[in-house]
Swiss-Prot record:
Species assigned in the record: Xenopus laevis
PANTHER family tied to this protein: ZINC FINGER AND BTB DOMAIN-CONTAINING PROTEIN 18 (PTHR24394:SF18), ZINC FINGER PROTEIN (PTHR24394)
Domain of life: Eukaryota
Name by which UniProt lists this protein: Zinc finger and BTB domain-containing protein 18
Similarity annotation: Belongs to the krueppel C2H2-type zinc-finger protein family. ZBTB18 subfamily.
Pfam families for this protein: BTB, zf-C2H2, zf-C2H2_4
């Protein structure tokens, strides 16, 4: 007579005994963490423990695991799986579980983790494509509306009437794109008299979304009567060729320039210079122009005015795809000036950071704005250093546990960890602390597993034996490499035989998956 629930009842009893410490005959050390368990269960679920306990069983009360590969939370999760048959990640990074399972040769768990990582990567790529496509549709819709808005604005009397700027979408070569974008905010500029037409335009735009002063669809301005020094143009040039221009609304909201009092006597002008071959003597310092082949600023102004959070990568990609065709035959005379528009801000704009603005503006009245986070800096050199932090943050960020507000973070390098134990172990790399000392020779080590590995030098012990040829090794890694090199075909034949006999999958000790994970 068969009892279907017998195996489940047996696992439940073993799990209760482990929690009570009853009949536990071994201790697994992962760094400073101790785990009591039963040898039979460990050897049945892990090829690593099976080889460890096969020889000299009575001398294997304590097992040291490599804490650089196996973390304490990951081993606790795998230990629960051994006793309960249920795998629950509990917010732990899948990469940590995968590394621990590969180290312990638990290949069923390795396959599950690889599958989850593959599904996660597929989901992220699909979501990114959907976001990009929806963003492109939104940009096309807003660009049509912005082109009509630009037609209603008055044009400058000195420029040609009814002049149109054709915006052609398409990919352009990044090497020929506009370079040296800079932003200037003079704090002491004479107020320019407003004409009747400008006053009407200002009144009409008060109830609508503010049009960006750096938008290519904005109306043309009068020539500025204020002259700037020639040296100022050289100092404020910064290479930001890949970044898209910022809208006026986004600039004012996110860089602490949200007060109408400051904007009343401020002139926001953006200049996108052409190729580096332009003669500096031909640049008129009394005029701050913008070239006709600039990007669609009206699109970015409409999108950012709606305060919708948009990921940086789609904005960059869309701005590059929608830049105008570069006209190599265009001369410097084709440049047009911007209008000195008064930007209307929302009544609920946050003014808490406003007092910091005068302190960061240089004595010459220039500030330099980051196109990624809209922070302002007094010099282009400081801005360049700040920009490098954005690109460092995009690489090497370890995934954080889900629903974990207090993530252990290193105060020196900012690296995050899954638990406080791994953080403390990481801090030794900065302090150089070596708390583990050999009693035989007095040599110190940073990690306990290094001390255990060193102890074999004095004992000349070779605890790891090959079950096929009885050859012995000092380290488990040497044994593993030996099995791969000399007995790989034998292991594969045994795994095929196990499948034919219908043996439990947990004892199927193939080396295909773990060999790629640990020993590349």
């Amino acid at each position: 007579m068969e009892f279907p629930e017998h195996s489940r009842h047996l696992l439940q009893c073993l799990s209760e005994q482990r929690h009570q410490g009853f009949l536990c005959d071994c201790t697994v050390l992962v760094g400073d963490a101790h785990f009591r368990a039963h040898r039979a269960v460990l050897a049945s679920c892990s090829m690593y423990f099976h080889l460890f306990y096969k020889d000299q069983l009575d001398k294997r009360d304590i097992v040291h695991l490599n804490s650089d590969i196996v973390t304490a939370p990951a081993f606790a999760l795998l230990l629960e799986f051994m006793y309960e048959g249920i795998l629950q990640f509990k917010g732990l990074p899948i990469e940590d579980v995968l590394a621990a399972a590969s180290y312990l040769h638990m290949y069923d768990i390795v396959k599950v983790c690889k599958k989850k990582l593959k599904e996660k990567a597929t989901t992220d790529s699909t979501k990114k494509e959907e976001d990009t496509s929806s963003f492109s549709d939104k940009v096309e819709c807003l660009s049509d509306g912005s082109s009509h808005m630009a037609g209603d604005l008055p044009s400058d009397e000195d420029d040609v009437e009814d002049e149109k700027i054709n915006i052609l979408p398409g990919k352009t070569d990044l090497a020929t794109e506009s370079r040296n974008m800079w932003i200037r905010l003079p704090t002491e500029s004479a107020s320019i008299p407003r004409t009747v037409g400008e006053a009407e335009t200002h009144t009409t735009a008060a109830g609508k979304t503010a049009v960006s002063p750096c938008s290519s669809t904005g109306s043309l301005s009068h020539r500025s009567a204020i002259s700037m020094g020639d040296s100022a143009d050289v100092d404020c040039v910064l290479d930001l060729s890949v970044k898209s221009s910022l809208s006026g609304t986004e600039t004012m909201n996110n860089s602490y320039l949200s007060s109408q009092e400051i904007l009343r006597n401020s002139l926001v002008q953006v200049k996108v210079e052409k190729e580096a071959t332009c003669d500096k003597n031909d640049i008129d310092t009394t005029e701050y122009d913008i070239e006709r082949n600039t990007v669609k600023e009206s699109v970015s102004s409409n999108i950012r005015a709606s305060y919708e959070p948009v990921h940086l990568a789609p904005i960059r990609e869309d701005s590059v795809l929608r830049e105008l065709d570069h006209d190599d035959k265009a001369s410097d005379d084709d440049m047009i000036t911007l209008e000195n528009e008064r930007v209307q801000m929302e009544a609920n704009t946050d003014n808490s950071l406003l007092p910091y603005v005068p302190n960061i503006i240089s004595p010459t009245g220039q500030i330099f704005m980051c196109p990624l986070c809209n922070k302002v800096f007094p010099s282009p050199h400081i801005l360049q250093i700040h920009l490098s932090t954005h690109f460092r943050e995009q690489e090497g960020i370890r995934s954080k546990p889900a629903n974990d507000v207090h993530v252990p973070t290193c105060s020196l390098c900012g690296k995050t960890f899954s638990c406080m134990y791994t953080l403390k172990r990481h801090e030794r790399t900065h302090s150089g602390e070596k708390p583990y000392t050999c009693t035989q020779c007095g040599k110190s080590f940073q990690y306990s597993h290094n001390l255990s590995r060193h102890a074999v030098v004095h004992t000349r012990e070779k605890p790891h034996a090959c079950k096929w040829c009885e050859r012995r090794f000092t380290q488990s890694g040497d044994l593993y490499r030996h099995i791969r090199k000399f007995h790989c075909e034998l292991v594969n034949s045994l795994s095929v035989k196990s499948e034919t006999l219908g043996l439990p999958a947990v004892r199927d000790w193939t080396l295909e998956d773990s060999s790629q994970e640990l020993w590349k």
